[in-house]
Amino acid sequence: MQDIRRDKFSGRIMGIDFGSKRIGISISDPTLTIAQGLFVLENNSKVFEEIKEICSQYNVGLIVIGLPVKLSGKHSNKTNEVVKFINELKSKLKIEVISWDERLTTKLAQKSKIEMNLKKKKRQDKNLNDVIASSLILQSYLDYLKNKETMVARNED
């Protein structure tokens, strides 16, 4: 997983949960405190252009993409597919793109749908799962940034 200093980018952060069919998209608030799920994009030939438009619309300065790793920390079969997508995204956009550990986000997304008391039909909505997963990935990164800033501030005192 990569890290990037807050002073290396400006604007909001976009979260992406990559899938071979669907891509969940989330966005941070302007203060980089809260992740909000937006929607799902179809993973097709237009996806890079659509991501570029969303970045422009929301003033995105950094993209965080969930990197699938096993609980042991080893790469999964899907990891290479995500890395290829990250490299292609970097080549098409002039925005910093980093990977972030997405372990258990799909399970947490499913659990959160149950906790929201959604009806069974709505809980089975795969698009909702992808949006929630992208929000969880992004929120994890935002929390990391906040904790890192707190630690730096304490060390400066």
Show the residue positions of the predicted features:
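Phosphate- and other anionic-substrate recognition elements at nucleic-acid/protein interfaces
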Residues: 1-14, 20-21, 26-157
